[in-house]
Amino acid sequence: GCTSVSLGTSGVVAAVSEAPVHDASGLVTGFADAAGAHLPLACTLNGARVLDAAKRVLGVTYDEFDALALSAAPGADGLVHVPYLEGERTPNLPGATGELTGMTLANLTPANFARAAVEGLLCLMGACLDAVRAQGVRIEEVTLVGGGAKWASVRSLSPSVLGVPVRVPPAGEYVAV
């Protein structure tokens, strides 16, 4: 079915399913539409603002941030950014804080920091996709929308990190997708 990944202030994975979902863990919320389809949804507290914060720390423009992130190797030479900057709801960790781990003198560079921020955010969205999949929803492709979709680094890295083809429609307001 259709699955969207929306990266705004928060991150949202929303799918369409023929069957209702009943997630005892509470990570996936089940909604329904007027036509009888079911709409499983997983939502994070931390979306594109994770990248805004990383960009601010680096003191660079959006384009410079993207160039830095895309210039670093996959995995950011072992630098890992856990993007729980405002706690988190998927997984349910309201008191969690962000982390930057795996730092060495060799890998603590602006490029690796930018790459780790993008990869960390996308891994968080991947966890949301996995939570929806665990409810029996097939996800073969995602549509990437929201302010985060404007970042070249997000568009470029999404397919490899999320593990599915990613479609990015023309910029617009897609709150109903």
Describe every region a protein language model picked out.
Residues 1-177:
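Active-site core segments that coordinate phosphate-bearing ligands/cofactors
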